[in-house]
Amino acid sequence: YTPDNYEYRSYQSLNIVTKHSNNTGTESILIAVLAYREQARKERGVENPEIVAAVTAHPALYKACRYFGVRLVKVPIDPVTFQMSLKHTEKALNSNTIAIYASVPTFTHGVIDDVESLSKLAQSRNIGLHVDNCLGGFLTSYMEKEGLLKKAKLFDFRVKGVTTMSVDVHKYGFASKGVSVVAFRDASLRQHSY
């Protein structure tokens, strides 16, 4: 990328401070969950952390929650759109909730969760919003640019409430097999991943 490149300029202007490069998308999700857990313990005193996710969440989230002692609160998907149910997500949020997990797209159906609406819920509760963009990270960005996503909604750091994103660079990003990245909106959250 060059400074004259639109994508470079727009992402630089978002002040995204940092990322972790990892061996797999699973590791990216593990690191994000660890960061949310530690941040909630240190800053809010949360002892029984929970993450709210749709039943269609990638199995890596189940593993991350099991490893780090985080309760996974599964909510149904909307029967019409197959997106994470906003109504059920809102009902599931409580003082132990450390983050909402959204998929872009879902592993099972290829549906993009309503990240903008989930972001509003996360911001209203002062919790994180992780966007699992491992499966479609590069494709969804270019599909949007080329006008191939009908009724496209924002799903990345352009949405204020998105605090972390996982992206598999090896899927259509021309990187070595397994290379993944977890990006943090700011360095203060990343500090909690160590």
Positions of predicted regions on the chain:
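Conserved PLP-enzyme active-site core in the AAT-like
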Residues: 8-13, 20-193
